[in-house]
Amino acid sequence: MQFLIPVVILCVSLVDSQKVLYNNEIGFNNGFYYAFWKDSGSATFTLESGGRYAGNWTTSTNNWVGGKGWNPGNSWRTVNYSGYYGINEYANSYLSLYGWTTNPLIEYYVVESYGSYSPLNCPGGTDEGSFTSGGATYQVRKCRRTNAPSIIGTQSFDQYFSVRTPKKGFGQVSGSVNFADHVQYWASKGLPLGTHAHQIFATEGYQSSGFADITVS
C-alpha cells in the first residue's frame, strides 16, 4: 500500500460545526488535531463535533488517509474509538492508530481492522513476534520504505506495524488501543520511537471504496 503522508496545504481552527474537506488539509477541530490527505480522486473528509470524523471514498482515489487525534502524540496514550467502518473484505483499507516520530524517523500503525491486504505481508519486512494487549494478540512487523514521502520530505525510514489478530470486523466497531503496550514491546525488539509528531486514529484506503464514521477519544 502506498502510505501517505500529510502535506501542509492549509491549517485552520474550527468551532463546533460540520465541515467537508475536498482537498488536503491539517489543523485543529474541537480540541482534536486532524489530517486529511489524498493523492488523487474524489475522497472527502468530514469534520464532525468532538473527536468524530467521516470519510467517503471511491476507486477514483488511488490512496487517501484521514483521522483525528493529537499533535504532538505521546507514547502512553490510551485511545478509544467507536463508529462505523464501511468496507468489505475485498477493499484495501486500514483502520488504525497512526503516527510519526522524528530522530529516528518512524511511521507507525496499530492496525485494528483491515480489508484485503495485511501489512504483515509487506515485502522485505521482518517479523518481530507477537504480544497481548487489551485481551487481543498483536503481530508485529517492521517494514522499510526507501525514498518515500514522509513528514520531512522524501526519505528512507522504517515502519512499525502492530496488527490485531483476529482483526476487528466491518460495520459497527469499537475498542481501545493502549499505545504504551505497543511502544514497550517495540522497544524490547530494538524498535525505538523518537520525538512524536502527529498521532491520529485514522482510516486509510488504497484503490478501493468505502465509508467510515469514527469517533475518537
Curated annotation (Swiss-Prot):
Domain GH11: 20-217
GO biological process, one term: digestion
Active site: E107 (nucleophile), E204 (proton donor)
Any one cellular-component term (Gene Ontology): extracellular region
Subcellular location: Secreted
Enzyme class name: hydrolase
Range of residues in the leader sequence: 1-17
InterPro entries associated with the record: ConA-like_dom_sf (IPR013320), GH11/12 (IPR013319), GH11_AS_1 (IPR018208), GH11_AS_2 (IPR033119), GH11_dom (IPR033123), Glyco_hydro_11 (IPR001137)
EC number: 3.2.1.8
Pathway(s) annotated for this protein in UniProt: Glycan degradation; xylan degradation
Residues listed as glycosylation sites in the UniProt record: N56, N80
Record Gene3D superfamilies: 2.60.120.180
Reaction(s) catalysed (UniProt annotation): Endohydrolysis of (1->4)-beta-D-xylosidic linkages in xylans
Molecular function per GO: endo-1,4-beta-xylanase activity
Family recorded in the similarity comment: Belongs to the glycosyl hydrolase 11 (cellulase G) family.
Keywords from the named record: Carbohydrate metabolism, Digestion, Glycoprotein, Glycosidase, Hydrolase, Polysaccharide degradation, Secreted, Signal, Xylan degradation
A Pfam family: Glyco_hydro_11
Expression tissues: Expressed in larval carcasses and gut, and adult gut.
Protein name (database record): Endo-1,4-beta-xylanase
Superkingdom, taxonomy of origin: Eukaryota
